[in-house]
Amino acid sequence: MQNSSLFEVMLRRVLIMQIYETIRETIPSGALELSAIVVTLHDAKKRRKKMMQSIRSCVLPLAMLTGGVFYGFFSRFSTAIPYFIFTMLLLTFCKLAPKDVKFKKLHLWLILIQILGSIAVYLIVSLFDTVTAQGAFICILAPTAMAAAVITGMLGGNVAFLTSYVLVSNIGTALAAPVIFSFMGPNTEMPFTDSFIYICREVMPLLILPLLAAWTIRAAAPPLHRALLKINPVTFYLWAFSLTIVTGRTVKFLSEQQNPDYTTEISLAAIALAICLAQFKAGKYIGNRYGERIAAGQGLGQKNTILAIWMSQMYLNPVASVGPASYVLWQNIVNSYQLWIKKNRDDKCASSHEARKK
């Protein structure tokens, strides 16, 4: 019995060794090939992502440079800007489900700062220069950028809160802008009622209808809604082309001025920088009290500058558009700095974690 048992044990060992050798000889080659393919695909994906990030980082200066150099050509397309804004908002709101919209007290504080702050700054700066005051005003009144939710996510903030504020911000601007614009710019020459109705007819549909259209499509035509979600990346290219057009229109107006006032233009760029930094700081300060430091900072600081430039060119002194045009650059520098800080912090945390492991 003992010999039989010993024989069975030895036989099992031999069989196990044979199976092991077979696996080692046959599978590794295929496994290595498969592993190599997986690694290659992963590396290719990482390289593609880095390449896209590099391309996107170059699009801002390239779009502004192209619009500035070829302003005569691109300024001809300025009538298309409202349609581009509508399309970008529609695609953005397609990602926002009604059930995800949750209003909080902080949303109210932020929209009050956005609307009342813009009026207060205008009244103060207008004591020195009206055009500079208009540029400062529009940099604050402009609604939150559609891309702010993306940056908020990259910084580790509450994307749901910020997405809800994009909605609040657009509705607030749509309601406030017609009233405020009626008291400044060329619209002051018209009776208030006529001016209000005229601006309402252009601004409110541009900001409200995309939301209504997106939610109607979501409920009534799910296949179309899914198709719109798939082409959502198109918003980036629409934004780039829109930036080229509004830059071209701004440069065209400035170059055709009979009596250019470079002091005003420099003042507009400088005050846009001050307002940009102040809005990011104020948003973070008040947001910190509600546990939404990052999201509130982006909500107040990152603006829909395409819309701001278009509104200033349509309803204010066109020179005032230098303010939001400069704001494009300032807010992107701030965002780049914030992302760099976040990356360095994450790298340090990862390094210290690895060190503790060792």
Language-model segments: what does each one mean?
Residues 3-6, 12-13:
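N-terminal amphipathic/hydrophobic targeting modules at extreme N-termini
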Residues 8, 21, 36, 43-44:
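Short hydrophobic alpha-helical segments enriched in small aliphatic residues
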Residues 9, 25-26:
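N-terminal start and proteolytic maturation junction detector
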Residues 13-19, 41:
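N-terminal polybasic/positive-inside topogenic patches
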Residues 41-358:
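Alpha-helical transmembrane segments of multi-pass small-molecule/ion transporters
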Residues 8-9, 33, 39, 355-356:
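Low-complexity, intrinsically disordered segments with a bias for serine/threonine
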